A protein has these predicted regions:
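Short, acidic Ser/Thr/Gly-rich low-complexity loop/linker segments typical of extracellular
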Residues: 78-103
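Short, ordered, surface-exposed loop/turn motifs in non-cytosolic proteins
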Residues: 62-75
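A short, solvent-exposed loop/turn motif at the edges and junctions
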Residues: 110-153
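Exposed aromatic-hydrophobic patches
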Residues: 103-109
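Extracellular beta-sheet/turn segments enriched in Thr/Pro/Gly and aliphatic residues
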Residues: 37-42, 161-213
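Single conserved hydrophobic/aromatic residue that forms the stacking wall/gate
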Residues: 1-6, 10-11
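Beta-strand-rich structural segments
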Residues: 47-62
Length: 213
């Protein structure tokens, strides 16, 4: 089922010492715009503001300068931009290039859980097996760097009710992270949304580890 829903790629075997992969899914768009370090994906959408930050590292823990992070997610209406004619083509899509420190950082809003399309063979399989069509909320990532294996993965919140029953079996233990609640006074400087946040926001910290190709 995970191969039918994420038709461009099944989950790959985990590289030794690297971050686990997960499903690509059918909603990735090539050519996403550059997302500066500290940039924002939420735009004018309402929702829980989240700062996603971390590093892109090699298996020894050294930062990988120039690595690219291609990120995308659903809008608050549970639709990807390619499913929703009311969204811009690259809504909630961006590509960030890290510097010599390997650090990435961007803001967005918390993605929501959604149902996979249930028409066609996927729906038939779900009906035959008695499974629901829900996926837990998640952020999608493709992480690339010269000389390293491409990583296609997802990162999930630890409090999602569908975490243990993902209909495409994409959840891996090391891909589950806590959305850490923060006060507005603690929002960092130097970000696109600095000085614009009122109320609580969340922090998600996650390091990606790539292995040599």
């Amino acid at each position: 089922l995970r191969c039918l829903v994420g038709s461009e790629m099944c989950i790959r075997d985990r590289p030794e010492e690297g971050t686990n992969s997960s499903v690509l899914g059918p909603f990735h768009i090539s050519g996403s715009p550059d997302l500066p370090i500290g940039g924002d994906l939420k735009g004018d959408w309402d929702g829980e503001v989240v700062l996603f930050k971390g590093r892109i590292l090699d298996a020894s823990g050294a930062p990988i300068a120039g690595a690219k992070l291609d990120v995308w997610q659903t809008a608050p209406n549970a639709l990807y931009s390619s499913q929703d004619p009311n969204q811009d083509t690259y809504s909630f899509h961006g590509v960030q290039t890290v510097g010599s420190d390997g650090i990435y950082a961007f803001t967005s809003i918390r993605p929501v859980a959604y149902t996979v399309p249930t028409d066609g063979p996927v729906g038939e399989i779900l009906n035959a097996t008695g499974r629901h069509p829900w996926r837990p909320s998640h952020m999608h990532y493709i992480v690339t760097a010269d000389g390293y294996r491409e990583l296609v993965t997802e990162v999930f919140p630890d409090d999602d009710p569908y975490l243990d029953q993902d209909t495409v079996f994409g959840v891996r233990e090391d891909l589950v992270m806590r959305y850490q609640p923060q006060d507005s006074d603690s929002f960092p400087d130097g970000l696109a949304l600095s000085g614009k946040i009122s109320g609580q926001w969340s922090l998600v910290e996650f390091d990606f580890v790539l292995t040599r190709g």
